[in-house]
Every structure is written in structure tokens, then in C-alpha cells.
Amino acid sequence: MTKYVFVTGGVVSSLGKGIAAASLAAILESRGLQVTLLKLDPYINVDPGTMSPFQHGEVFVTEDGAETDLDLGHYERFISARMRKVNNFTTGQIYESVLRKERRGDYLGKTVQVIPHITNEIQDFVARGAEAAWNGATDVAIVEIGGTVGDIESLPFLEAARQMSLRMGRNNAAFVHLTLVPYIASAGELKTKPTQHSVQKLREIGIYPNVLLCRADRRIPDDERAKISMFSNVPLDAVISVWDVDSIYKIPAMLHKQGVDNIVCEALGLTPPPADLSMWDNLVDALEHPQDSVTIGMVGKYVDLTESYKSLSEALVHAGIHTRSKVNIEYIDSEDIETRGTDQLKHLDAILVPGGFGKRGTEGKIAAIRYARENGVPYLGICLGMQLAVIEFARHVAGLGGANSTEFDPAAPHPVVALITEWMDREGRVERRDNSSDLGGTMRKGAQRCPIRPGTRAQSIYGDDVNERHRHRYEVNNVYVPRLEDAGMVISARTPTENLPEMMELPSHPWFVGVQFHPEFTSTPRDGHPLFSSYIRAALEHKAQRAKEA
């Protein structure tokens, strides 16, 4: 029988519940348990796919094509289990499901209410998500409840968790509450009152936390922990100090040293073997003792909110770990390049243009790509970054003046990137789309395996085929591929069914690669990722070459 750990948050949002949940999962996995994680989001959107990055941050795409919360990216980076659509659901999905049942008559004419119908549906979704992992043999499912205790939106989820723990009985559910202990500089002290009130609010609805994770910008002294313990009715050894660190990969060791996993295992009636966190210790050691460093320029339009590129930033960190180098990421606003030019790129060891949507800032990205191509700077283009690399090459090398994407200019004289109106989904069904189709359901999403052209850089990186995740509506237009290849571009991977370009490269350049997929979603600190490791090695070589020429 699967046991559950519910992770809640108090005082303020963005405290790092996802990191805390993933870190606990990593410790339990190191103790030999089969663990999965779920994220419950209280917003009414069906999924975050059409939400602004400024509102929600990154949209993480799972292997089965679900557009999910960025916390699922943390989950995959911390444990070995792969996340799926069932690992993340929202209030919108719950209500959508309940309303469908009501229309079908499943409730036999009863008045449909939040309790019991909505809360029962939440419990069914949670159980289904837990059973989907490990062929139904999940030992522990850690369930992160989004939002903050006291929010109206979170109440049905908290009530469902309370009911679930009651129904399952003793030693089958535990609660971990993450809260803020702010430091007031003018008073020179930490304040525990917000945490006390947060726990009181939780207890009012019938939830009594087994563990309190107290987040602060410094270690919380024992006397303050004792005060929190007394007023919150949580044992002192379960009041855990969680202070700011320079790497999220230090959190598992921090929690383990304070006995969090032992408290949770005791609450769940589990006696697994001791934890082995040597892998995490080695990762942290590699992070703290790099042998070299590189500076990567990430050119985008969401640079003021780096959460929009969370998986990508982490993938570069992973590549640094596996090349024993410190990767410094410099976020550059593409609109700034449009006004100030490319001189601000001269100090960079490599340039990267990530995925994105919309016309704003695209000419700045194209200027950065041209700078990388003409100056031999290693370049990696992801999704939109590949499409813009094709546009830049078409304009300035292949002689296709005015080349563009129909996303930005529907009347472009040379639409080298266009909306593909018909394609086959992962199940082999033919789907059609056009400019009037709903944004939430018209993208190519999820993992797809593609053969790689022999003798290419792509083959030296990936081998004979590549299996990566997608999230895009537009594709490189096959009509123009012969003209591009005649000018020196190589299409190094194509989809097996539609023959759509998946990877491009420039053999005449030291390292210039574009990919239509999102490799950042499959990078982990344990294994890194071959594409990003190759890219960072190229950046190190470029840096060394520039130093020789200086």
C-alpha cells in the first residue's frame, strides 16, 4: 500500500516547497524506497500551457506531452522516476472532470458540492498519480499542495488531504509544512510569529504537521526553534532549520543531517536501510571545486524572470558539473541588442538562444545568432533558437532576403519557418491545425524518437538516434531545405514520419547546433546531458583559443 507525505506551505509563496519535496524524495530514494511526487495547483487554468512566463515561470513538458508546473522539473532532477501527466493537476482539471460526470448523470441527480464531490475527485486524482509510478508498487508518494495555507483556492486540496489521511489510518500519511521565519534587520532578530500563525491556521482545518521546515536567510538558533516547537505543538527535533544556500543540490544533505527522513519514516511506520547520499556529496564537490569557468550568454526576452528558463539554467549547471567547470550564465535582453548592438556579446565564451513565443525581441536574437556564426562563437539554438538560426542563415548566407517565420510575418516572401497544418501525434493519429486553432491544444508536445544523419556532429553527441521532448507549433519549412543545404547547412536529424527537420548544424563553424526539441527537460545532475556537455566543452575550447590569440 502506498503511503503519502503531504507538503504544504505557509506565510508566503515561492519558499521552495518543490525543492523541499524533491529533496525529501531524493533522501527516501537513497534509502531504497520507490518514490514518486505529485504537484497539486490551485489555479483554475486547466494547465500552465497558455499562461505568461511572467505569471507562472517555465512550463515543464513531460515525456507523455503534458504541460506542467516547473516543480516537476525539479522532481525529475532529484529522483529517478519520470513524471507524467498524472503527476500534476489543477483546480481547472478537477472541476472539468466533475462537471463532465455531472453532465453524464454520474451523480444520479444529487446536488454537486465542494464536499464531497470536489474533494473526492482530488483524492481520486492523487491516488491515480501515485499508482502510475513503479507499476503500481510505489512505496511513498510525496504530494506538494501549491499555494499558501489560508488561501481560499487551496482549501479543497487541504481538506482532501485531511480526509485522505483520516481514511488511510495511522502510519500511512504524514504532513510536512514549509514556512518562513523572517529576519527583521531593524530589530536584529528572527520573528517566529508568522510561523506560529501559519501552523495554527493549518491545525484549524484538522491538519497537524509532523515536520516543520523553517525557511530563513540564516540558521535558526535553538532557542527560536524551541519557541516555535512550544507554540506550534511540534516536537523540537521536528522543527528543522532550512537556511539559504548557493546550490539547491545541498538541500538533501541539509535535511538528512537534521533527521527529516527519520521523522517521516517513523510517522509512516517504515524502517528502510540508512541513506546513502554520496552521489549528492560528489555533485556538490564538483560544483565547489571547478577546474575552469565559462561565461554563456543566454539571449531571450524573459531575462528579468529567470524562472522562465529554470530547466535550461539547471542543464547548464549540470554540464558544468560533468566538465568540472563553473558555468556563469549572463542573461541578455534581446531587445537591448536591437537598440545597442552586439558589442555586449564580445566577452562571451558561447551564445544560447532558448525557446519562446511571439515576435518581440526576435530581431535582437537574430543579430546575436549572426554574431556567433560570423565570429566562430559556439552557438546552441533551442526550439525558437533553431528556427531563428535558420532564418538568419537564409537571409545572410543562402540569399533569401526577407526570410522569416509566418509566426512573425504571415506575408514573408520566404517563409522558411511555417505552421505545419497536418502532422501525426504520438499515438499515430493525424491532427490538423491552423492559425485559428486553440493555443492550448495545437502544439507538437512530448517525446519523439528521430534517427540521426551519419557523420554529423549530432551523431557524435547523441549516437544513431535522439529521443527528446517537444513544445512548439512552427517547423522549418521543407520547401527551403535544399536551398539551405546548398548554402552549407546540414539537417542532421528528421522526424521519422513527417520528415520534419529536428536538428541543424554548420560544419564550417567550430560548434553551431540548433535543435527543434527541448533537451533541457531531460538533463539531470546525476547524468548531465550529452548536448549540453558538448556545448560547454566547445565554450571552454573557444575561451582557450581566444586566450592564445590575445
Swiss-Prot record:
Functional pathway: Pyrimidine metabolism; CTP biosynthesis via de novo pathway; CTP from UDP: step 2/2
Binding site for ATP: 14-19, 71
GO MF, one annotated term: CTP synthase activity
Record field: catalytic activity: UTP + L-glutamine + ATP + H2O = CTP + L-glutamate + ADP + phosphate + 2 H(+); L-glutamine + H2O = L-glutamate + NH4(+); UTP + NH4(+) + ATP = CTP + ADP + phosphate + 2 H(+)
Location of the active site: 383, 518, 520
Keyword Transferase: no
Keywords, sorted A to Z: ATP-binding, Glutamine amidotransferase, Ligase, Magnesium, Metal-binding, Nucleotide-binding, Pyrimidine biosynthesis
Cellular component per GO, a single term: cytosol
Nucleotide-binding recorded as keyword: yes
BP-aspect Gene Ontology terms: 'de novo' CTP biosynthetic process; pyrimidine nucleobase biosynthetic process
Binding site for Mg(2+): 71, 144
EC number: 6.3.4.2
Ranges for domain Glutamine amidotransferase type-1: 295-545
Pfam families membership: CTP_synth_N, GATase
Annotated stretches, region: Amidoligase domain: 1-270
Residues given in the record as CTP binding sites: 13, 151-153, 191-196, 227
Region described as Disordered: 430-459
Further remarks about this protein from its record: CTPSs have evolved a hybrid strategy for distinguishing between UTP and CTP. The overlapping regions of the product feedback inhibitory and substrate sites recognize a common feature in both compounds, the triphosphate moiety. To differentiate isosteric substrate and product pyrimidine rings, an additional pocket far from the expected kinase/ligase catalytic site, specifically recognizes the cytosine and ribose portions of the product inhibitor.
Family: Belongs to the CTP synthase family.
Described purpose of this protein according to its UniProt entry: Catalyzes the ATP-dependent amination of UTP to CTP with either L-glutamine or ammonia as the source of nitrogen. Regulates intracellular CTP levels through interactions with the four ribonucleotide triphosphates.
PANTHER family in alphabetical order: CTP SYNTHASE (PTHR11550), CTP SYNTHASE-RELATED (PTHR11550:SF0)
Protein name: CTP synthase
Encoding gene, per UniProt annotation: pyrG
